[in-house]
Amino acid sequence: NPDANGWHFTWSSCCRNSNITNGLADAGFTLRAVMYSYTDSLGQVLPSNDQCHDSSPKFYEIPRTILEVGNGNDPSAPAFSNGFTYSHNAFDEEKDSISYTWGIPLSNVGYDYLTPNSTALPFSAPYSYTNPINNIFLNSTTGRTWYPANQQGNFVTCTKVSAFKCGQLVSEIYREIQVVIIPPTCNIGLNANECNV
């Protein structure tokens, strides 16, 4: 059985984009998931015999990574809804409850499951792992993110999805997406034949 620290599944590689705006460019990265044991209603601790009895949440939305400045801009919309909205659409097959928080992106150097954040990607001010894009918002229940998409750049984001079975944490999966916001290539309101793409 995994101990209180869980089983950590990682994959690391080099390198991140050279043009990252909010953190260390060219650093490596580590993708990860953590599985924890839980006690069922009969008092049995699972997983047993080194076999997993649970799966982590899966993402049913492909990453939207390249956007134009002003994407989703609607001057008549309420201020909070005026921007780009994205949902990870995480789903847990066992119907475990899930919640979303910002995760800490990691480099590819020396992952330590006891202190995984020791290899955290350093962010450049004013950015942080909880504010990887200016004015970004994450709904912890739905996983929807919203941001104004009003600044060009390459932004590393990391979302942690935690799954709970009967109130017990059973898994965490971290999803990194690099969002690239480029200059406008198509004027809003033009049809597809008039766009410069």
What is each PLM-predicted segment?
Residues 1-195:
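Long, compositionally biased, intrinsically disordered segments
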